[in-house]
Amino acid sequence: MTITLEEIVGIDVAKDKLDVAVLGQKATTEAFNTQKGITSLVKKMCQLKPKLIVVEATGGYEEMLVLGLFEAGLPVALVSP
């Protein structure tokens, strides 16, 4: 199985915001690190259908995001920065 760059998403997590990048694309997206912002981002990820979403572990700020992605059935990996 071959995975193209467009099928991998990286999310940089901070207390107040999430920076989202799709590999192979220059543009990035921002979302608020709130329940509303995460819900919107999860919906977008469901439409994109990436093969992998890599989320930065940041001492707890990522928990709500990872749970939302996981509950939506999206492939998520939590990695140390």
Predicted features by range, described:
Residues M1-P81:
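Phosphate- and other anionic-substrate recognition elements at nucleic-acid/protein interfaces
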